[in-house]
Amino acid sequence: MGKEYNIQEALKMAIQAEKDSMDFYRRASAATKNVRAKKVFELLANEEVGHLKSFFDHYKGGDFGDLKSFMESPPNKKNATYQALEKAISGETHEQAALEIALKEEKSCIEQYSVIVKDIIDPLVRAVFQKVVKETENHYALIEDEYMHVMKMVDKSDQDIYVRE
């Protein structure tokens, strides 16, 4: 039997996690000089907004106020991931460090949501979590590709060139 009574807690946790991720990617984008990495961070921030909205639609609590105000609220600077980013920004290789932090966070999110989805009874809420897991897996692949590019490794955009030569 699933833990339906915990669904609102799971949604609350997911909403806060997505807000933290959105803030992280916005801050990373603002601090990044590499045009390609900046675009990746902007794309990820916008996708986190979509995740946040999806979870918010099913959340019945009033802890966050209205969606617009919550999204515009200042970032949680006590969040460990945000603090790690701020520390990384002071270094010369902050794009690399930000991508490494992002990889860890996306992987953690995939693991956490995959565990939660197993206990969700409501098919609509379950579908939201499943969709977000798939999209987060795509985020991980995108970040991994950008990390390889920043580190001057072969990435997906270069693979065709190397195969043909």
Show the residue positions of the predicted features:
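Iron-associated oxidoreductase/ferritin-like identity signal
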Residues: 1-165
